[in-house]
Amino acid sequence: MANDYLFTSESVSEGHPDKVADQISDAILDAILEQDKYSRVAAETLCNTGLVVLAGEITTTANIDYIQIARDTIKRIGYDNTDYGIDYKGCAVLVAYDKQSPDIAQGVDRAHDDNLDQGAGDQGLMFGYACDETPELMPLPIYLSHRLVERQASLRRDGRLQWLRPDAKSQVTVRYVDGKPDSIDTVVLSTQHAPDIELPALREAVIEEIIKPTLPAELIKGDIKFLVNPTGRFVIGGPQGDCGLTGRKIIVDTYGGAAPHGGGAFSGKDPSKVDRSAAYAGRYVAKNIVAAGLASRALIQVSYAIGVAEPTSVMVNTFGTGRVSDAVITKLVREHFDLRPKGIIKMLDLLRPIYEKTAAYGHFGREEPEFSWEATDKALALAEAAGVEPTARVA
């Protein structure tokens, strides 16, 4: 890659239609796990103008009011008026869940002498990533993009900008020099709004109240391009503006394009699905590698075959930043992390109802107490095994 380049990532708010769908799917998953933590859940959601469709496969002993959970989630997000795009009180909610296929279940349920030998719920490949661009060990563009739409939601909820509505999108372009963030080049923020706010007043408020307080002062160099509601009007939003679907914001959910993605979405899936659990484990592994001081960037790929517990492959790439070889780090990963599906579930304590919180503002890089995959508790052991000094980020 060139020595001096621009890189861009985007995020969306909790009121974006695809994120509404993700949050409903994960709220349903949490409700099920509260009653039956061994449930098999693949909860998909579609939301459109005045309509929510719940479909997928669920096998559980839990007794759940799916319709009420969908309405409560829409209400929490802030859609309590049809003028905003959907109204939790009046929208239709259709439920069409099947049970998990027995052909899939037999491969996942099969147990051997080792009770950690549960097979993977599907084939596939998953990635984890970490870098030293932020204290949270996340790429800076996606980190800032999340913080912008989080602040938009905060100012909407506390009433400081009463004309804000739930739907919003952000995009941040960062200039890199010698592989490190040097300055912010462009910030795009589009926010749904009440019809009576004038565009100049909206743009000034968004720049002064949302964007500028979010940007790190040391990265503000020269003139930043601020593009606020570039189309000029964003009154129609949410599920009325676009049909929302679970799993359609997988790059927003992860690393903003700074790392590859295996293609599998997260929301609505119980942790027997390696699409979710192995991606969380990949983040955990990568973050501990960087926190241990083994590298300043780390990418992990892990792959699985359906019904087979052991990964079919584990790969580590540190992009030339490693203080020991990638082969040595890969060996350490194999020794210090159990990447079998049930091993991941045990290692990260994933049978908890913790997932609705993940469904907006990123699954990674957030210091939430439930997010066990953000811990750096393996870093000291990795550093000692590799013979290097850990960084100050070990926690």
From Swiss-Prot:
UniProt keyword annotations, A-Z: ATP-binding, Cytoplasm, Magnesium, Metal-binding, Nucleotide-binding, One-carbon metabolism, Potassium, Transferase
Cofactor: Mg(2+); K(+)
Chief place of localization: cytoplasm
InterPro entries assigned: ADOMET_SYNTHASE_CS, S-AdoMet_synt_C, S-AdoMet_synt_central, S-AdoMet_synt_N, S-AdoMet_synthetase, S-AdoMet_synthetase_sfam
Cofactor: record remark: Binds 2 divalent ions per subunit. Binds 1 potassium ion per subunit.
Reactions catalysed: L-methionine + ATP + H2O = S-adenosyl-L-methionine + phosphate + diphosphate
Signal sequence extent: none
Region (Flexible loop): 100-110
Record-given protein name: S-adenosylmethionine synthase
Provenance organism: Burkholderia cenocepacia (strain HI2424)
Gene designation per UniProt: metK
